[in-house]
Amino acid sequence: MIFSKKKISSLFSKGMVIPKTAQDTIPFYEVYENGIFLVGEDRYTLIFSFENLDYSLLRENEQMDTYQDYQKLLNALPTDIQYQEFIMNSSINADKLRKSMMPKERRYGELYDDYCEIIEENVKRSELACAKKIMLIALSYKPQTKVDNINVLFKYFREMQTYFDKMKSDVHQLMPEEVFAILHEYYHPFDNIEFLLPSDLYARGGKIKDYIAPSSFAFKGKEVEVGTAFTRIMYVHRYDRELDDTFLSELLDNNFKITVSKHILRIDKGEALEKVRQEIFDVQGKIQKRMEDNHKKGGNFVPFRLTDKLKELEDLQERLSGSNIELFEVSLFISLSAETKDELEELTKHIKTKASKHQVTINYLTRQQDKGMNTVLPFGVNHLGSAVSTYLLTDAAAILIPFSYRTYFSDSGIFYGINKVTNSAIILDRTEEMNSNGFVLGPSGSGKSVFVKLEIADVLFKYPNDEIIVIDPDNEYGALIQKENFDGEVLKLSPNSPTKFNIFDIDLSYSEEGKDAISIKSEFIMTVIETAKGYKLESNEKSIIDRCVRIAYHDFQLSEGRDTDKLPTLTTLYNLLREQPEPEAIQLALILELYVTGSFRSFADKTNINISKKFLVFDIFDMGEQLRAVGLQIILEYVWQRVIENKKKGIRTWLWVDEFSIMFNDGSNSETSQSGKFFVKVYSRIRKHGGVATGITQNIIDVLASPEARSMLNNAEFKVLLPQKSDNLKEISRLFELSPSQEAFLKSGEKGTGLIICGKKIIPFDKKIAPHGKVYETISTNFKEYQQKIN
């Protein structure tokens, strides 16, 4: 128990005297370490959060599925539980957002200054966006007998969790400190400061409510002065029979200080039917009496209101007799807060107008604002009882579905643009997903390269200790590494390039699936030689290669990997093959001759690149198709060795492969397609060892034609879809199961916009930047602008 134990019952036996302080107004009395709150005489509450859904972006059939699943949730509510949904608009914390988005270190000169200006513009834009939603559920329970146990709340929570899981909404129980923070935000709507409890609270003799409560409460007829803010509690008096599922979202999808609380109590089916039968008897009795009275006067007419009510009751009786229909007592409360009385009146007018649009009547709670406020708070207690309730059947109660749009903010994430629906910043951490690997898909001119370069810049600024590697077939990314730009190294690879990579670079301590490092390296070298050969190796050829690889590493092994002078090279293997007695060995050496003593010897000697740089771009524009088939595999092997080395140091490695479709069409025209297969292997390995890999392509149809590439797309948790051409759009929509409303974001043709698919989330985004400044100048691929710059 967090509060010291008291004899609470005496308070209730006195009928709960009027609170003497602001702290006394907060409607809980004890809270326990397991998260349960005592909120009334023998009444206990468990509180948990649930995740919003992008309900409005779902397909029509998906919305219907969610609506039906929500009905099942309501139908499953125990009749001894008071169920409450609490949805509060929570202001964007600009300082927190700024802290998350701004660079961790001041570096890169003018780039840093311009980047910070871009971030600040987006922070200000987000401040005006739709507020994020705090979404809670409170389950309130009062034991009726001595054998009843309040721990049944946890059982009910687990049962509800299965329903929310089916709707793809994550739920988790709130611990007391989390609830306190939410209460503090409700009571201090315009403070916009983080709630913190001192670690020595009890040593000071303090009380938790001292840190939650506002400075004062002043309950007026139709509003409450809460500290320096003005709050008004209203309730829904009447619903339209044809109410649609957008009502709640239209109330809440803004940046006003609005909270909606919905209390639902399921009525026992037998009790409900008995009440309806009794109502029918009463109405039938009234009709019979009117007929008798009218007969005496020479007429036989009956008022329409009675016949209509009887028909409604008979329809209700018939529907309630069905297996999927329940009766609920529903109360809906709306809390509005503003900084001045005039602003409160304006906000009230706005909300009533929104409600009128849906034929919903909203009334004030006159001289009951205190009870109303305590009813709004997430403790599962309706302090106004049935006085403001409406009885609804399952389908009508479920139309008040709580889902609308998600907001996306991760403290550890990077900025992925502005949400095109909510206008708020999208901050995502790809590494939080089950599979952080991803793809960026967009035709030429869609803003693909600019998006990727901005993501690279975001990583460089946000994660200064991480390492970045780009495989660049079109000579696009070298501009990022220039004087006064980002610090890194461009490695140009071509037949005559001075840049060297040693195919034998190895970490002897590494093992995988029961294989030691040399066995794994031997398999890789077989793959390279097979690609160079143009068709599959025979088993005797593999044996010869494996033998020579092990001989080549012998002296390096004896030094336990410490003597780098003894590290073999492709030249070592070439010479060993020439020394073997088998004629096949001479043929294998002949295959390698082109790459050792011939025109393509970039991979014959020891690695000579500056390995201290944390940003490397492999420029393969001039590599040529003949060298590319082997070269891509060797580059990927080098990347893989870097990933292993970085993991030991606690460094994350980010890899971007532009036009990754070349991996599946490497120019070898061989039946082996080894580059694609090896890319699939390295791509999956990187994720398992703390890396983040991204494939980029404009040739989506070519990629989908490859089973391996298609499988990679399906399994990746992170995909960026930029505006698509019509012939690609249909295939993409089918592959990613996009709804028509989601598909519309890919039809706009607006550069730098589209959809981000991150796990279960599909987010419409806009990551355009203004066409000026150092950042834009560094990342722009606009040829006309380039011409103007050099002329």
Predicted regions and their residues:
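Hydrophobic positions on the alpha1 helix immediately C-terminal to the Walker A/P-loop
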Residues: 451
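Post-Walker A helix-loop "phosphate-sensing" segment adjacent to the P-loop in P-loop NTPases
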Residues: 458-469, 488
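P-loop NTPase motor domains
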Residues: 53, 60-79, 86, 90, ...
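Conserved lysine of the Walker
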Residues: 448
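Extended, folded cores of ATP/NTP-driven motor/assembly subunits in large transport
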Residues: 1-403
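Hydrophobic anchor at the beta1->P-loop junction of P-loop NTPases
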Residues: 440
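Conserved P-loop NTPase
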Residues: 739-790
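Conserved AAA+ ATPase "SRH/arginine-finger" region at the nucleotide-binding site
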Residues: 491-496, 718-727
